[in-house]
Design a protein with these regions (language model features):
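Fungal secretory targeting signals
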Residues: 1-24
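Non-catalytic, mobile gating and regulatory segments of ester bond hydrolases
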Residues: 18-170, 174-294
Length: 294
């Protein structure tokens, strides 16, 4: 596991060859947006907690106490999954939140060797079935496809039962990559999800990033100089969608609206990409200790 982490560190250092220590003109977020980013960071955090992936029908909870907004709502998991025998060991859940009238899909970030194998399998694969000229990270796309059919079926049933509820897809790190790719496919299928990701790596080429940007309804959150959003490197053709919500405050601090800069532009070299000292600790703190259950 340490070796795999070092491979990602090497990739991030390669990314720094094109990064510039620049920063766009800050545009703070509203209190409402901050509230949404905070809420869905806690939904992403819940995916790391094992009680949310092995007991369908229970309320969503976090044994480390890092998802109080979720725990205070009227929630029930409708489908929990941990595909240990499938490529990428994708884990997470689909839940209903009757308090906020939400259907939430939350993908777990990296925990197992299979997760890391999917992470470092970053050769491009054809994604023209998603959009013209698009190429995706091979490992992430294959991992999404391992759960796509069953999960989409469960979402379809949930949408029929909970008419008028908003569909949200979220995840941190590897889970954020799956949320992004899954979100594109679900939008193409007419489901119209909002996607919130935290510390996600790049998932495809510039054409894919532009397509995601044009679809809209993406809140891609980064934190200071977090290592993971810097990989796979832009030098080999990977790109991020826009906009980026860049948290500029440090670890273990309360984030305010003025601590988040909105960075606009596909493949921008500002925000997280403009920082020069990749930090693994920054990856764990997204409006709270997001992977405390890991």
């Amino acid at each position: 596991m340490l070796l795999l982490g070092r491979l990602w560190s090497i990739a991030a250092l390669a990314a720094l060859t094109v990064a510039a220590p620049s920063r766009s003109v800050p545009r703070d977020v509203s209190a409402d947006v901050l509230g949404q980013l905070t809420l869905f960071s806690q939904w992403a955090a819940a995916s790391y907690c094992t009680n949310n992936s092995n007991s369908t029908g229970d309320g969503v909870s976090c044994e480390q106490g890092n998802c109080p907004l979720v725990e205070s709502a009227d929630t029930t998991t409708l489908y929990e999954f941990d595909e240990t025998s499938s490529y990428g060991d994708v884990a997470g859940f689909l839940a209903v939140d009757k308090t906020n009238k939400l259907l939430v899909v939350s993908f777990r970030g990296s925990r197992t060797l299979s997760n890391w194998i999917a992470n470092i399998n970053f050769g491009f694969t054809d994604a023209s079935s998603i959009c013209s000229g698009c190429e995706a990270h091979g490992g992430f796309l294959e991992a999404w496809e391992a759960v796509a059919a069953d999960l989409t079926s469960k979402i379809k049933a949930a949408k029929a039962t909970y008419s008028g509820y908003t569909l949200v897809v979220t995840g941190h790190s590897y889970g954020g990559a799956l949320a992004t790719l899954g979100g594109i496919v679900l939008r193409n299928g007419g489901y119209e999800p909002s996607v919130y990701t935290y510390g996600q790596p790049r998932v495809g080429n510039k054409a894919l990033a532009q397509y995601i940007t044009d679809q809209g309804s993406l809140w891609r959150v980064t934190h200071t100089d977090d290592l993971v959003p810097k990989v796979p490197p832009a030098t080999v053709g990977f790109s991020h969608a826009s906009p980026e919500y860049w948290i500029t405050s440090g670890d273990n601090t309360t984030v305010t609206s003025s601590d988040i800069d909105v960075i606009v532009g596909v493949g921008s070299k500002s925000g997280n990409a403009g920082t020069l000292n990749p930090d693994t600790a920054a990856h764990n703190w997204y409006l709270g200790h997001i992977d405390a259950c890991k």
